[in-house]
C-alpha cells in the first residue's frame, strides 16, 4: 500500500509540474502582493494545484485496492481528507479555487485514462489489493485497539489483532 501511495505522489508530481510549466499561472500573492500567506509562497506556478492532484490521485488509487466493505466504510473519509488538503492550500493563500479544482480533475483524468494502462502501477495495485484482501479477512495491524476488537460500524468482520505489529 505504501508503494502504491508513493507511486501516486510521484506520478502526480511529474504530471502536475508539466501542467504548471505549460500554464505558468501566477500565485495569489503575485496578484496581491500584500497577501500574507500562511506558508512561504513556492517559486513555481500555481495551476494546477499539485497538492490537490497528488492527494486526489492517491485517494483514488487506495480506493482501487480496498475491499468493498472497507471502501464503503472509509471511502467518504478518504475523499474528505483529499479534498481538505486542497482546500487548506486555498485557505493558506497559496492557490485559487480553480487551481484546486484543476488538480482534482487532472487526477481523475489520470486515474481514468492512464493508470489502467501502466503495467507497473497495475502490479503495485495488485500487491496492495492482496495486502487488504488477504485470505478473505483483512487484519489491520499497528492500530491501538484491544485484542481482537471488531469494528462494528463497518459490518465487515474486520479483526484487529494487537501484538502483531510489524516495524
Predicted regions and their residues:
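Interfacial segments of alpha-helical transmembrane regions
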Residues: 1-12
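Metal-dependent C-N hydrolase catalytic cores
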Residues: 1-3, 19-22
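Membrane-embedded catalytic cores of phosphoryl/pyrophosphoryl-handling enzymes
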Residues: 21, 25-167
Amino acid at each position: 500500500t505504501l508503494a502504491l501511495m508513493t507511486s501516486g505522489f510521484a506520478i502526480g508530481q511529474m504530471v502536475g509540474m508539466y501542467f504548471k510549466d505549460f500554464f505558468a499561472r501566477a500565485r495569489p500573492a503575485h496578484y496581491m502582493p500584500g497577501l500574507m500567506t500562511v506558508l512561504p509562497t513556492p517559486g513555481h506556478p500555481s495551476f494546477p494545484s499539485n497538492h490537490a492532484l497528488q492527494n486526489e490521485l492517491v485517494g483514488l488509487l487506495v480506493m482501487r485496492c480496498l475491499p468493498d466493505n472497507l471502501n464503503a466504510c472509509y471511502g467518504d473519509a478518504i475523499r474528505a481528507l483529499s479534498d481538505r488538503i486542497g482546500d487548506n492550500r486555498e485557505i493558506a493563500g497559496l492557490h485559487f479555487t480553480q487551481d484546486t479544482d484543476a488538480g482534482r480533475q487532472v487526477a481523475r483524468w489520470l486515474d481514468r485514462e492512464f493508470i489502467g494502462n501502466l503495467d507497473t502501477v497495475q502490479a503495485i495495485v495488485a500487491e496492495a489489493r492482496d495486502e487488504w484482501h488477504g485470505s478473505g479477512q483483512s487484519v489491520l495491524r499497528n492500530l491501538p485497539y484491544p485484542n481482537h476488537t471488531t469494528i462494528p460500524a463497518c459490518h465487515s468482520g474486520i479483526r484487529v489483532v494487537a501484538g502483531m505489529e510489524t516495524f
